[in-house]
Every structure is written in C-alpha cells, then in structure tokens.
Amino acid sequence: MELAIIVAAAENHVIGRDNGLIWHLSADLKRFKALTTGHAILMGRKTFESMGRALPNRRNVVISGNPGFVAPGAEVVPDIPKALELLKGEERVFVLGGGSIYREFWDKASQLYLTEVHTSPEGDTFIPAIDPDKWELIGREDHYADEKNEFDYSFLDYRYPKIFFRIAFDRSFR
C-alpha cells in the first residue's frame, strides 16, 4: 500500500480554523478530485464532519475514538492500526487530515501533494513543516488568483525517499 498525503496549507502551515477551510480554490478542489477518485481516502472524524458526507467514487475510511460514531457511506475504525489493517489490500491510500492525522502520517507517507496557498492567515489547525532533507520536491506549478481562486497558490508534489519511508513505516504503528 502506498500512502499519500494530500493537503492545502497556507505559507505559515495553517490548514484550517474552527473545523473548516479558510479559503476557496476551485483549482485545488479539481486537483483533489482528480487525484483521489478511485482510491481509498483516510481521515479523522472532524475532517469527515467538515465535509458533511462521504466522497463518491472513493473508499472512505474514518478514524474515530468514539465507538458510537456513524459516518454514512464510510467505514469507521477506532485507530490507525485498525485503519491500516482494513486498507492493506488497497494500492494507494490518500490521507486527508485533519491536523492530528497528518502529524501521525507525516513521515510515513511516500508522497505529499501540497497546495501551498500564498497567504498567512490565523488558524487553529496546522501541518508540520516540510523537512527538505527527507522530502524531495518533484513537481511545482505556480498559479495566480483569479475569479475562481481567491489567492495565489502553488501545486507542490513531494516524494519521501524510499529508504526513509521503509524504515519509518516498518517501525511505525507497532
């Protein structure tokens, strides 16, 4: 199974405020859909609740410590090891967040699809900094704000070198 993180974050690493996104970027939503459709997606309860529903044409898996939590259209598991066990037959799994889920998988994913939003808003949810000694930038597209995208933004694709990925993944979740 290949783990890939997909996230939109501001230059100051903010990804959200009050359990929601701070910006609207139509191009980012289109990229998200193109990359994740047909694959499994893994997220925490708050992320699922902020989306309001399971996403179509994807296997939705939600991690929640609340045994009574129900997510229509999604499979709910109590923790990360159970999620990985459930998803072990999947070729690729996209990690959607939120903040604590990103932190758990940050050094365990082999790819990172980052939409860097060129602003620095206040927020209450963050991603970790990208360590250039571990993450290799393999693709970049810069875009300007327009009528459908309120801020300048960049699509940044990173690869986590395999030696680090294998060691980190093998030692994780034990």
Where are these predicted regions, by residue range?
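Enzymes that bind and transform nitrogen-containing heteroaromatic metabolites
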Residues: 1-174
